Amino acid sequence: MLHGLRRLLTKPEGNTLAAPPPGPVPAAPQSQRAQEANAAPGAEAPPEPQAARKRIIFDISDLIQFLRESRIPSGIQRVQLNIIHYAVTDFRDRTNPVIVYFDQAQNDWLHIPEDIFLALYQATEAHDEADEEAFLALMQGLSKHQPLAAHLARFSPRDHFFLVNLGSSWWIENYFQKIRQLRKFHDLRYVPMIHDCIPLMVPEHCPRALVEDFRHWFFGAMLQADAVLTNSQWSGKDIRHHLNAAFPDAELAIHPIALNGNMRSHLAARALTEMDTVRHILPSKAPFILCVGTLESRKNHVLLFKAWARLIEHHGIEAVPYLICLGRAGWLFDEPAEFLRANPALHDRILLISSLTDGALATLYEECLFSIFNSFYEGWGLPVTESLSFGTLSLVASNTSLTEAGGKAAVYFRDNDLEDLSEKLEMLIFDTAKRLALRDHARANAEIRDWRIVADEFIDRILATEPSAAQRQEKCLRLPLGHLIHLGKAPAATPPSERALGDLLRDGLNWHRPEDWGSWTKPGVARLCLPLPDDMAEQDFLFCLRLRGPAFATPIKINIFADGEHVFGPIERTIGRGKRLGLWFSLRLNAKQLRLDIDGGAGTSLGPNDRDVGIGVTHLMLCHAEDAEARRSFLRAFPEFGLASRIKGRAILERIDIPAP
């Protein structure tokens, strides 16, 4: 299956670009081109500029991260692979695709040539152990490719780019700063895919770090995105709910696109070759029911296990089919695991399997009596769609988006209702005629589409996206008066607007990731760009900034700009080792934006194998000069600026008057 992969890895020219090829020569100004044309009698007129093209940049960072751990894709990875495969092949003339991933070591997006992506796609379709070495070499070579910025320099400055992530990106450091940096040089529209709002809707079923990272990313995305793709009407409703709660006046296009693609067309061809694998799992011809999904608390496996215990109690173990639970170990599986340990009879009827090849999965779908899918909350329900695409009946919890995934084809049980689940299981297991009739009904009513059609809908939505992020930021974001803004990871109670604002203020790429206390700048100049309230004219304001010194005394310079014009500085100070510096700037400006350029100099290392940093920035606040309560709240928040601490040299608090321009 991967016969071309080794050839691809050993082409004489190689796929690695040691240095970027020469970029396009900048077009001369129109007057200069006219002079050159007139200078040469009989010379042809210069060619007209090429028409602008639309180009989709597919960010597959999470897909690459997944493939580094497993060559067998899960549901969301299959979705990405199928859609981008069609974008690169059948719809290439429309998408003009650029494929990238974020390389953590280089802190940059790297371009992945299309033939390399197609080789990766082929590698996930096949699982020949003989080609494993070639697959690993392919993955290891990704970091040698060209940075995205250099690759984009090949194209016309008139081109329109659409940055699309069909997976997730909230784990990438300073993702939105990188997007804003690209927008400074290109006409870029950002169109993320949000599969669900599970960390916001049921945080009790998610790791705390995931909840915080997702919350931070989500509200930033609501301001950075030009449109949002999602997989169900239910998820679209959730996204709209949180958007409106955080930014009541925000307008954002949200496009639900059903992920009801035909997985059978991709998996079934390998099903017969995997029959032996399945028969190693089960006794020959043993009936079984299939449950596909991560082993985690949100999937509510304990309800299934209780139902199986009840079936065994009522009908005897020999009459009860096996339950195969296929999925990786996830978050908080303790309760169902403990239930299994406490009920030995279940050990002979419930099998937990962490991973299988696509062919083995296809065999399980085709051979099972029916599938079952239970969950407290979903964004779509890919296992339901997968099952129906194989013509296999699915018994599904009646909640969230699962009724969209199952449509009129699935059989439903009431949410988290053991009685109803047990009744439906008994009907489907012991009434063969009824089960077969429901299966035939499912096959006649399942709304399954070819992945080419799904990809076509995605591409239509993406390419129709108009710029909207800048207008939304202008409308929804202004530095609030008298509010302390944290520039690190915001506490859970932080209002979404302030959470998003803290991320938006850090401009450019010279910032490290936010931490609980604040953010380190990188060596050199880091920028804070502050959108000011509309009523700044003819009023006196106080701008408060709190800085943190690294392990060594650090000289800094601060220059202040209003609407791009330099108005004050440099302010030169030295922050002692680990000390805190509070600067209160008194100013009167008639401007829409205040910018601070903070120069941390050559920087300081945080330790062996750690980062080089400039200075730490923790909090800021803008208030009316006469707002004594706001000033007191700043001092209450940071006791080190009290008189006793300042006398002992632990902190410095300084007021700086900036003359009106």
Question: What are the roles of these predicted feature ranges?
Answer:
Residues A526-Q539, W584-N590:
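Extracellular and analogous surface-interaction loops
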Residues A537-I556:
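A short beta-strand element within beta-rich, extracytoplasmic domains
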Residues L2-P22, P26-G502, R506-P523, K557, ...:
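Carbohydrate transferase catalytic cores enriched for Leloir-type hexosyltransferases
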